[in-house]
Amino acid sequence: MEFFISMSETIKYNDDDHKTLFLKTLNEQRLEGEFCDIAIVVEDVKFRAHRCVLAACSTYFKKLFKKLEVDSSSVIEIDFLRSDIFEEVLNYMYTAKISVKKEDVNLMMSSGQILGIRFLDKLCSQKRDVSSPDESNGQSKSKYCLKLNRPIGDAADAQDDDVEEIGDQDDSPSDDTVEGTPPSQEDGKSPTTTLRVQEAILKELGSEEVRKVNCYGQEVESMETPESKDLGSQTPQALTFNDGMSEVKDEQTPGWTTAASDMKFEYLLYGHHREQIACQACGKTFSDEGRLRKHEKLHTADRPFVCEMCTKGFTTQAHLKEHLKIHTGYKPYSCEVCGKSFIRAPDLKKHERVHSNERPFACHMCDKAFKHKSHLKDHERRHRGEKPFVCGSCTKAFAKASDLKRHENNMHSERKQVTPSAIQSETEQLQAAAMAAEAEQQLETIACS
């Protein structure tokens, strides 16, 4: 406990433990579900949290809560993160600590950029303490951790301050490689070293696949660890990041100036640059392979409930019952304006927008709005430059499934490929078959007589 006495005898006390206890208490309340006023659903996993904490840590949630009217019963579904990644992000918000698997470092950085969490977004410019395995028994631990402490003050100064190197200068890692083998303790120095996360640190991960990561306007190469790379341990390894509980100055961080990145943030908030993976069966796109595999099971799953009228199969009895309405012609939902009837209530709701001209699905990268969510998704793909629908004949890609279908009908359909000679040949074959049938009929008539 420290205290200061000014000339006016005003005593000020600083409780150094308050911030730690404050976060600890908040986290305990979250884990017990106490005073939680928001639920976040990620991949069917529900996370309870406090809106004030989410908004304080993430500019994404801050903007989202301002745009949406939410209360204690509100549930927000996020479809651009894995549940395990979001769980670690949430733990970071409440504990200032985060553990990341090496193969997920790039994904965590991308998540930090999307959610507007500066510490996670700046992992590529942070400094990490490399903790080596314990070799006291001649064997390494099952894991070693890279411990990252958040730099304090200006970002430029943070890159040069508090860098402690282990070993002689000649033994330090080069700009091209960083050895994962722990340093020897015979020199009497600590087995922990702090390194700048620049290109050398990123190359420590090794790579067969290199992709670009945007770090406040500068592109660096980020690489994923190949399985054959030996970094000092044959067992799975993890990265542990600790965010110091330092006072955050009210200054604009490079790359997040309000004027320059407002549109960029809107793009990240509602239509970020994640690469989309398309289902080969129906063309629906997903942000990660896990969701795609889950969706593909819908195409390959058993469909024991078969419609007797059209033989179409369904996975559940409820889906079959809903389908049967098509054959019965039963349309219980009628439009009050024009009287048109529909089988399903959602279809009626879509139709009513024709009369009201309501466009509830707005693009947050421009001012355009749409009546249907599917139209908005097609529009957002154009912003992101995504073309997940690929023609199987010529490999040309399209942003909309309808564009692909139109292309296939116009360029690769059978009627387009039929040449005049083929038509003539087919006509001659039909004529020959007709003449043969007529001759055969005449022979049968003669035989009967």
Swiss-Prot record:
Signal peptide: none annotated. One of its GO terms (cellular component) is nucleolus. The BTB/POZ domain seems to direct the protein to discrete regions in the nucleus. PROSITE patterns: BTB, ZINC_FINGER_C2H2_1, ZINC_FINGER_C2H2_2. This is Zinc finger and BTB domain-containing protein 14. It comes from Mus musculus (Mouse). SMART domains: BTB (SM00225), ZnF_C2H2 (SM00355). Coiled coil: none annotated. It comes from the Eukaryota. Residues 156-194, 405-424 are annotated as: Disordered. Residues 157-178 have a biased composition (Acidic residues). The keyword Nucleus applies. Transcriptional activator of the dopamine transporter (DAT), binding it's promoter at the consensus sequence 5'-CCTGCACAGTTCACGGA-3'. Binds to 5'-d(GCC)(n)-3' trinucleotide repeats in promoter regions and acts as a repressor of the FMR1 gene. Transcriptional repressor of MYC and thymidine kinase promoters. Belongs to the krueppel C2H2-type zinc-finger protein family. There is a cross-link at K46, K203, K249 (Glycyl lysine isopeptide (Lys-Gly) (interchain with G-Cter in SUMO2)). Ubiquitous. It is found in: Nucleus. A zinc finger (C2H2-type) spans 277-304, 305-332, 333-360, 361-388, 389-417. Residues 36-102 form the BTB domain. GO terms for molecular function: DNA-binding transcription factor activity; DNA-binding transcription repressor activity, RNA polymerase II-specific; RNA polymerase II cis-regulatory region sequence-specific DNA binding; sequence-specific DNA binding; transcription cis-regulatory region binding; zinc ion binding. Pfam families: BTB (PF00651), zf-C2H2 (PF00096). One of its GO terms (biological process) is negative regulation of transcription by RNA polymerase II. CDD domains: BTB_POZ_ZBTB14.
